[in-house]
Amino acid sequence: MTVRCVLATIDLEGLGLDRGGHLLIQHALEGVPVGAEVLVRGNDPSLRVHLGAWARSQGHTVRDGAIVVRGSATSARWSGAERAGGYAPNGAVQHPGPTWGVAARGALVEAGGPTLRFDLEDKDLVWSDLAPRLYAQAAASQWDPNTAVEWDAPFDLPAEVEAAVVQVMTYLVENEQVALIVPARFLGRIHPHFREVLQVLAVQAADEARHMEVFARRAALRGGPLGVSGAGGRASLATLLNEPDFALASFLLSVLGEGTFLNLLGFLEVHAPDPISRSITALARQDEARHVAFGMAHLEHQAALDSALRARLRAAVERRHDALMETVGLNQQVFDALVLLAAGSWQPQAIARGYAAVEQLQHAMDDGRQRRLVRLGFPHDEAKALSALHTRNFM
């Protein structure tokens, strides 16, 4: 039943509907019920022609050329709308509506529209309560490779030591490229309702892009060619690219791979022979720590809800180990370069110290993996066994 109200009046003066006058009329109509009349005045010569056309397009009627009678079309349009959860992180729903698509979380979603499906649209498969805080930290910690690193810092290295640095940097670039591709692949598969997760993965990819830049830039700093890329290392990294499951990919890359890399970057921060290499590995290490933290938080959340997750994680480690059994693992040139960097010279005693330092690094990597596995609920003996199966290529 329509409601007949006393006329309201709006004066557009010289403003035409083709210049924004419709906004004032629409605003006036929103304040009256269906069936109410609004008198529209103005001195634009096309007002009456435009008013009739606009009113019909909006489901209203016009009488006497200047009185708009509010229709019900606008109200009816939103009668079946629903809220897409709430704006805040605790407003994320378990399963977003099939027609919500890319609507912002918390928006009022008009009924209808296309059904947009995402592979990962179950909150438990992607969520971490830590994601909003990690994203905020990451956004506040972004650094510019051109200004955060003193690229013209003076240093002079023997040719063999410079070659060792170049080899390690070449290896780091190779690994960082994969560390960028993996999260980037999942960005298009996760429902945007879980925007904090997308933000974390997006900034993670941006982090890796910077790491690729600074490591490649240091490798080429003295104008020589880059180092070698071993087939075994590339085979190890390919297994990360071939993993389609988000939880398993996060586990293999972030918890095991990048977690192991934290130790390597810390090692280089101490033993790198020049200030630029020490600086860029320190910067990268800060970023990688966030990546590991998100991977752990996500898997801890999922493990608390899915008792079968640990069996799947175990199977992923074993499957990857079996696939890489025939490969040589870490490139010998990379291992030797790490020894030389830790040694600092070609003296036998120095080389012995360098070799011991790399062995200690590998033990620290193993200890770190075991601690993270225990945090995910694996018994200590199983954590030790699974850590031992991790790729010899570190990542």
Predicted feature locations:
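Intrinsic disorder
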Residues: 1-52, 56-106
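Terminal targeting/low-complexity segments that flank the catalytic cores of oxidoreductases
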Residues: 24, 75-199, 220-221, 225, ...
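Short glycine-/small-residue-rich flexible loop motifs, especially phosphate/cofactor-binding loops
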Residues: 52, 216, 266, 370
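Alpha-helical transition-metal enzyme core signature, strongest for iron centers
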Residues: 55, 172-180, 201-219, 251-262, ...
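Short glycine/serine- and small hydrophobic-enriched flexible loop segments
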Residues: 185-188, 266-270, 297-300
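Active-site-proximal alpha-helical scaffolds that flank and shape metal-associated catalytic sites
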Residues: 217-289, 319
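A beta-strand-loop signature enriched in Asp, Gly, Thr, and Trp
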Residues: 280-284, 291-320, 324
